[in-house]
């Protein structure tokens, strides 16, 4: 196929096609942005995953909307100005990987349950699109993590994470014996089910479920949360964003797994070492809401605030 000339403005649309409301919301996106001369890029797997979404694409093309269907590729967002996400937090994390590679902002519209990473709910899609068309969103940079697995001093695998790196024992295996090291110094040795190393963005995700504190996203820090540690000092720790956090597995123990944002998996052999540092490439986050993070925390977790009188 002969590549067509790139449109002046292009938005990559990433959709959770398993949700019933995704097709109608995507159709609304295509109609509004198409009417304003913005081209859409859609992943081929999503275009054919649901028949109704595929039909919507054909209908929009017939109406003159510029739609490009492309195969999944790490560089698929190159040439786009924004990645627009319709889905939950899992879909957002998938889209953030594409946006980070292209170094463009990612904007989430929640179709899931909590949608902590999303900027708006599905019913506000028209308002979201007004901001996209006018480019009236602001862009924040969110800290990400570089993740390296070593064995005998050699790098055997590496990755990155926006939310967290989760060190976990394998299925049906015993407790992991680990040594936690921060800034090149040992902190504690203990047995555990795993250890999470999280960003402030990820502090409301798996790290929160494991007993970690909530960190405001504009705080620059790295959070270390032992998971079911058999130790007197098995408490979460908040470190400098410039610290190197390392976790060593005991040499005569079991292999372990590392999950980056619950998506990308690596294996750490017994005696191996996990190193986590701040990554030089952040995720660019498109923001519409000027309300403080406190409001989002209360809303998403449905925290009781009855009786508050304020100033």
Swiss-Prot record:
Keyword Nucleotide-binding assigned: yes
Source domain of life: Bacteria
Pfam families for the chain: NAD_kinase, NAD_kinase_C
Segments traversing the membrane: none
Coiled coil: none
Keywords: ATP-binding, Cytoplasm, Kinase, NAD, NADP, Nucleotide-binding, Transferase
Localization per record: Cytoplasm
Catalytic activity as recorded in UniProt: NAD(+) + ATP = ADP + NADP(+) + H(+)
Catalytic residues (UniProt): 89 (proton acceptor)
Example of a GO cellular component annotation carried by this entry: cytoplasm
EC main group: transferase
InterPro entries: ATP-NAD_kinase_N (IPR017438), ATP-NAD_kinase_PpnK-typ_C (IPR017437), NAD/diacylglycerol_kinase_sf (IPR016064), NADK (IPR002504)
Biological process according to GO: NAD metabolic process; NADP biosynthetic process
Family: Belongs to the NAD kinase family.
Protein name stated in the entry: NAD kinase
Organism in which the protein naturally occurs: Mycobacterium leprae (strain TN)
Gene this protein is translated from: nadK
């Amino acid at each position: 196929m002969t590549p067509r000339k790139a449109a002046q403005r292009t938005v990559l649309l990433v959709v959770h096609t398993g949700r019933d409301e995704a097709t109608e919301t995507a159709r609304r996106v295509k109609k509004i942005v198409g009417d304003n001369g913005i081209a859409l890029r859609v992943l081929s797997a999503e275009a054919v995953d649901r028949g109704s979404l595929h039909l919507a694409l054909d209908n929009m093309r017939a109406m003159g909307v510029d739609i490009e269907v492309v195969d999944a590729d790490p560089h698929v967002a190159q040439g786009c100005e924004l990645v627009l996400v319709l889905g939950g937090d899992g879909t957002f994390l998938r889209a953030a990987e594409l946006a980070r590679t292209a170094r463009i902002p990612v904007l989430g519209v929640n179709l899931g349950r909590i949608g902590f990473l999303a900027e708006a709910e599905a019913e506000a899609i028209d308002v979201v699109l007004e901001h996209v068309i006018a480019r009236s969103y602001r862009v924040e940079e969110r800290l990400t993590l570089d993740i390296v697995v070593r064995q005998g001093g050699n790098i055997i695998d590496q990755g990155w994470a926006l939310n967290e790196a989760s060190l976990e024992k394998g299925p049906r295996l015993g407790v992991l014996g680990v040594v936690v090291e921060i800034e090149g110094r040992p902190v504690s040795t203990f047995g555990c089910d795993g250890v999470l190393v999280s960003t402030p963005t990820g502090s409301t995700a798996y790290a929160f479920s494991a007993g970690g504190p909530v960190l405001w996203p504009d705080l620059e820090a790295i959070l270390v949360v032992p998971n079911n540690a058999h130790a007197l000092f098995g408490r979460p720790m908040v470190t400098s964003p410039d610290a190197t956090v390392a976790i060593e597995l005991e040499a005569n123990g079991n292999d372990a797994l590392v999950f980056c944002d619950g998506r990308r998996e690596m294996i750490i052999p017994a005696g191996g070492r996990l190193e986590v540092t701040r990554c030089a490439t952040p995720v660019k986050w498109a923001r519409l809401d000027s309300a403080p993070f406190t409001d989002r925390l209360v809303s998403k977790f449905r925290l009781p605030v009855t009786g508050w009188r304020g100033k």
